[in-house]
Curated annotation (Swiss-Prot):
Record keyword Kinase present: yes
Organism: Pseudomonas fluorescens (strain Pf0-1)
InterPro entries per the UniProt record, alphabetical: GK/Ca_channel_bsu (IPR008145), Guanylate_kin-like_dom (IPR008144), Guanylate_kinase (IPR017665), Guanylate_kinase_CS (IPR020590), P-loop_NTPase (IPR027417)
Compartments where located: Cytoplasm
EC number: 2.7.4.8
Gene giving rise to this polypeptide: gmk
Main subcellular localisation: cytoplasm
Name of this chain's protein: Guanylate kinase
Function: Essential for recycling GMP and indirectly, cGMP.
GO molecular function, one term: ATP binding
Keyword line: ATP-binding, Cytoplasm, Kinase, Nucleotide-binding, Transferase
Pfam families in UniProt: Guanylate_kin
Binding site for ATP: 13-20
Reaction(s) the record says it catalyses: GMP + ATP = GDP + ADP
Amino acid sequence: MTHSTGTLYIISAPSGAGKSSLVKALTDTNPDIRVSISHTTRAMRPGEVDGVNYHFVTREEFVKMGEHGDFLERAEVFGNFYGTSQSRLQQTLDEGHDLILEIDWQGAEQVRKLMPQARSIFILPPSLQALHQRLTNRGQDSDEIIDGRMREAVSEMSHYVEYDYLIINDDFAHALDDLKAIFRANQLQQKRQQVRFGKLLAELLG
């Protein structure tokens, strides 16, 4: 049994929709699925680890990487820069691993132009009230910042129509099942199975 090239999955959601929790739950039970680690200039949050959650860099370092053409995509969100290393991403796909890219709609738009074969998933909260409550429960941001994130969320959610799949994160377990189903269905595509089970297929067909 051999491996095929992995699939790139773009996953986007407004802040507070539960994207990071869903992705972590998915990869905890599916070690072959990898998550692209972006570079960012934003401050590290409590519990985050450099090189695990993000590669935390200074604005000067980020600009220098951009000048060298290191980024597949980059965007500015709430005054902070985010970017994805193209070489690291391609290496992971070539090794046969499915790879998740957690980026906003602006970054997704850039990636689709360069990698049109990528699959895209948008995650929505069940309501604006639920989204506001989740942001408040984090206990990390001021009311002013939360209000800004809510305004940004409404704008970002309008871009769901640009994505292949839509998940409503009302019940976490159900949303996780939906996410797993997307990955599983793609792994069973005929072209990927043909590569994975080439020897078996040759034997079956004589």
